[in-house]
C-alpha cells in the first residue's frame, strides 16, 4: 500500500495520501493550508485519482484545502456531523491569533459532503477499507481512521488527527473540548489496538500504540 504525508501550512498539519498502489484511487486525509500544490505532485507522480477527502475534525489547519481538493477532483469530503459546521466556520473557538491568520479567507462547504454519523462504521474508498471511530475530546466531532494491514509488513495504521500524538495528546481547552471525553476516547478506541499499530497523527512524528502506551506521560496508568 502507498502511504505518504507532508506538513501543510503555517500550523504544519500533516496531510496524508493513501492508495492501494500507484495508478489507483487515493484517499486524502486532512488537507491543510496550501496543501494543493504538494498534493498534485504526489498524485501526478503516482498516477493517483482522489476518491475521498477524510477529515479527522473540523479545525482550520485540518480542513483548509478540503473544499478545493474535493471540488477540483469531484470527490466527497467525509466529516463527523458534530464538526460539519466548521467547514464554513473553521476558526470557531480558536481565538484571535488564528483569526488573524485567516483574515480575508472565505470558506464554504465542498459540493459533496458525507457525514460520518455511525461510530464503528466501515467504508470502502478506492479499494481501501477504512474503519471510523468517533473520538470526542479535542472536538465533539473528532474521529480516527483505521486501515488494517496497510504497511509493507502488514501493520495496521490509525490516523489520529489531534487526539493522540507522539508523547502527547490533543488539547481540550478550545470550544467543544473535554479532557474527560478525550481520555475516554483514547482508552476505549486507541489503547485497545495492537501495540504494533502505526499512529499517523495530525502533527509531528509517527509513532505506535505500544510506544505511546509505554512512554506517553499523559497516558500513565491508563488501560482497558
From Swiss-Prot:
Record keywords: Hydrolase, Metal-binding, Zinc
InterPro entries, sorted: MBL_Glyoxalase_II, Metallo-B-lactamas, RibonucZ/Hydroxyglut_hydro
Domain of life: Bacteria
Cofactor(s) listed: Zn(2+)
Keyword Hydrolase among UniProt keywords: yes
Keyword Transcription: no
Record: residues binding Zn(2+) 2: 61-62, 162, 203
Pfam family, one: Lactamase_B
Top-level class of the enzyme under EC nomenclature: hydrolase
GO molecular function annotation: hydrolase activity; metal ion binding
Entry EC no(s): 3.-.-.-
Gene3D superfamilies with a match to the protein in the record: Ribonuclease Z/Hydroxyacylglutathione hydrolase-like (3.60.15.10)
PANTHER family: HYDROXYACYLGLUTATHIONE HYDROLASE GLOC
Family indicated by similarity: Belongs to the metallo-beta-lactamase superfamily. Glyoxalase II family.
Protein name, UniProt field: Uncharacterized protein Mb2612c
Organism expressing this protein natively: Mycobacterium bovis (strain ATCC BAA-935 / AF2122/97)
Amino acid at each position: 500500500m502507498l502511504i505518504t504525508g507532508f506538513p501543510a501550512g503555517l500550523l504544519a498539519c500533516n496531510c496524508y495520501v493513501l492508495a492501494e498502489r500507484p495508478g489507483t484511487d487515493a484517499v486524502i486525509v486532512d488537507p491543510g493550508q496550501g496543501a494543493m500544490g504538494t498534493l498534485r505532485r504526489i498524485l501526478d507522480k503516482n498516477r493517483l485519482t482522489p476518491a475521498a477527502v477524510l477529515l479527522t475534525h473540523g479545525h482550520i489547519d485540518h480542513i483548509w484545502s478540503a473544499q478545493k481538493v474535493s471540488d477540483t477532483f469531484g470527490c466527497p469530503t467525509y466529516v463527523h456531523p458534530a464538526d460539519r459546521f466548521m467547514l464554513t466556520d473553521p476558526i470557531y473557538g480558536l481565538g484571535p491569533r488564528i483569526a488573524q491568520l485567516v483574515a480575508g479567507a472565505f470558506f464554504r462547504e465542498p459540493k459533496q459532503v458525507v457525514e460520518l454519523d455511525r461510530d464503528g462504521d466501515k467504508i470502502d474508498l478506492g479499494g481501501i477499507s477504512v474503519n471510523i471511530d468517533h473520538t470526542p475530546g479535542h472536538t465533539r466531532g473528532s474521529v480516527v481512521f483505521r486501515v488494517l494491514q496497510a504497511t509493507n509488513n502488514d501493520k495496521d495504521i490509525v490516523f489520529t488527527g489531534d487526539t493522540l500524538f507522539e508523547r502527547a495528546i490533543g488539547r481540550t481547552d478550545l470550544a467543544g473540548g473535554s479532557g474527560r471525553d478525550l481520555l475516554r476516547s483514547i482508552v476505549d478506541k486507541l489503547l485497545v489496538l495492537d501495540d504494533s499499530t502505526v499512529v499517523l497523527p495530525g502533527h509531528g512524528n509517527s509513532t505506535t500504540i505500544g510506544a505511546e502506551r509505554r512512554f506517553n506521560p499523559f497516558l500513565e496508568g491508563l488501560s482497558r
